[in-house]
Amino acid sequence: MGKNNIFAIQKISYDKNILSIFGGGNMANVVEPTLTDDLVQTLRKECIVMVATTDFEKQVPNVSAISWVYALSKTSIRFAVDQRSRIVENIRHSTGVVLTIMANESVFSISGAGEILTDRMEGISLKLTVIEVKVQEVRDVMFYGAKLATEPTYEKTYDLRAAKKLDNQVLVGMKEL
């Protein structure tokens, strides 16, 4: 065995020891081509999702928090945003989208191509655009040696009955497109 092979074996052994010292973690940075069943279920419930697109004017990342999100399948996610949102114009210029979610004790980055399904949802008082993301890659991006103790939550700051009614209308509308 050559000198370089010995160093490689020592490095692998070192990495495994570090992994066990820090109590696990995602040393492999697992990459999947589709959503897991757990992520599909999470993306069918109310949750906070970060959406990253490329700003069409500045060509820098643009990140927004959204909650009207629904996973149709392991390969398709829909979300709704105000039609004036920068996300809409960004996707018109560049279809690349990254959705980030904190769930299942970790942080996941979901990359894909976004397509505007409708510029304005029918039957909803707000002017909402629906975008569908075709999932291309799912990465567990949680830093090594840690897990999420709790998932982020939020509270609605407007009329709860009106919010529930609107949320239901948007969810049904996204599914039916």
Language model segments and positions:
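Binding-site signature for planar aromatic cofactors or substrates
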Residues: 6-177
